[in-house]
Swiss-Prot record:
Superkingdom of origin organism: Eukaryota
Domain comment in the entry: Lacks alpha-helical transmembrane segments, suggesting that it resides in the membrane via beta-sheet conformations similar to those predicted for other outer membrane proteins and porin.
PANTHER family: MITOCHONDRIAL DISTRIBUTION AND MORPHOLOGY PROTEIN 10
InterPro entries with a match to the protein in the record: Mdm10
Protein name (Swiss-Prot/TrEMBL): Mitochondrial distribution and morphology protein 10
Protein family: Belongs to the MDM10 family.
GO cellular component: a single term: ERMES complex
Length: 421
């Protein structure tokens, strides 16, 4: 479960960038597990300012104070308190990349955003400034400061587009410079209608880095394919990532198996060391059984009526008329099939968006790490709760006999509570 300030920033930013190219697999496999007790209290003091204070206990008491200001208007329609928030908005879950998801999404325009956070008792500071010059270009400045002379400043110049994304990065840490890009290969809409195939597209992204102080380069590229099932309308995503310098190859398959579940499998392989790993992850959503949304009825498919002899009504030849009637019947069935596929996709995503979920279970495991990660996110009486653990496998020797026993013990265990007004 993401924090409140990240939820506010996420509502203002686009996820059409290289960083979110493999978001679906990361959300199902590498989700964050709390390792201590943490309580976070947030509120919206003015229409443009947000405040957060949190306290955590991990052997010692730690905490932080966060402040955010933005000149965005109309955030009341997007930012909800913990009692009215949609749990799908604050949980890192399967990311729908296809175009039909933007059913009820609203765009909020803003020119600047200021974010600051101070940790205590160590007094670490972190901040961020986002300044938009145009609708598609912005500059992001992030910095981290502490008393042990650890001061890092990183600047980003980002340019967004419907199909393209470009980003230049400069950091004071080893004078690191980087360039990241993303291009979406979207098929042109059909002249007849928007069909299933217009919701399938390929995304290609890459990143190039160079540490000027040590002259250490690195690069990576990622390919993503998104589509829907023709019969059920459920989305699925395939990614392939490759780092040529380290020889790391990673492939993922993520699918929304139903409106209440998602599954992901990832296979990693190194070309140089021949090491491999297989990771599995899934999430199970629970719907509120007391509150049923009446408006979740499936929309009726729109049938396109093609009149007989549509292409030629002036032919006097009986044989030619029979051929034209066969052509009309063929095109009519194709149009109905196109509309049926589109209706199935739109109905699935509309039904998913309108469902009232109360909690979600997440599970992930890895053959190489031999662990089991469990996370539960949910709502209870206006509070947002997140509890999880990571079980790892260890071998212990039995004193009575020399046989080794396999045991599992929790390497991480924690509980996080959030409340916002």
């Amino acid at each position: 479960m993401i924090e409140y300030m990240n939820y506010v920033i996420k509502s203002l930013q686009s996820n059409n960038d290289y960083e979110h190219l493999t978001l679906s697999s990361r959300s199902l496999l590498n989700f964050k597990i709390p390792n201590a007790f943490k309580f976070q209290l947030s509120n919206k003091s003015t229409p443009y300012t947000y405040n957060t204070i949190d306290i955590s206990t991990n052997k010692v008491i730690n905490g932080s104070i966060t402040y955010l200001y933005t000149d965005a208007k109309g955030l009341d329609k997007l930012i909800k308190d913990s009692h009215n928030i949609n749990i799908q908005s604050i949980v890192e879950t399967y990311n729908h990349h296809c175009k039909t998801l933007n059913i009820n999404k609203q765009n909020v325009d803003f020119k600047s955003l200021y974010y600051g956070r101070m940790y205590y008792p160590n007094s670490h500071l972190e901040g961020m400034i986002i300044k938009k010059f145009t609708t598609n270009t912005q500059v992001v400045l992030k910095w981290v400061s502490s008393f042990n002379s650890c001061n890092i400043i990183t600047g980003y110049f980002q340019k967004y587009g419907k199909r393209n994304f470009q980003e230049l990065i400069v950091s004071s840490n080893d004078f690191l410079c980087g360039y990241r890009f993303l291009h979406n290969f979207i098929e042109q809409p059909s002249k007849l209608n928007n069909s299933l195939y217009n919701n399938s597209y390929i995304s290609l992204g890459g990143e190039f880095w160079l540490a000027i102080s040590t002259l250490s380069p690195t690069c990576a590229t990622t390919l993503r394919y998104c589509t829907h099932s023709a019969t059920t309308g459920r989305p699925l995503t395939l990614t392939l990532s490759f780092n040529p310098l380290f020889g790391h190859l990673s492939s993922t398959y993520s699918a929304k198996t139903s409106s209440n579940s998602a599954f992901c499998v990832q296979y990693d392989f190194n070309l140089y060391s021949i090491d491999s790993n297989l990771s599995l992850g899934c999430e199970l959503w629970k719907q509120n059984e007391l509150i049923q949304n009446v408006s979740q009825e499936k929309s009726k498919k729109q049938e396109i009526q093609v009149p007989p002899n549509f292409y030629n009504n002036n032919s006097n030849d009986a044989k030619q008329k029979r051929i034209l009637n066969d052509l009309n019947t063929t095109f009519e069935s194709s149009l109905k099939k196109i509309d049926k596929e589109r209706a199935v996709i739109e109905n699935f995503e509309t039904d998913l968006y309108n469902k009232d979920f109360t909690s979600v279970w997440k599970f992930s495991t890895s053959l190489r790490d031999k662990n089991l990660c469990i996370l539960w996110d949910g709502k209870f009486k206006g509070f947002l709760l997140s509890a999880g653990t990571e079980l790892i496998r260890i071998n212990t020797n039995n004193e009575n006999n020399s046989q080794s026993l396999v045991k599992f013990y929790p390497a991480k265990l924690g509980l996080q509570l959030q409340f916002s007004t």
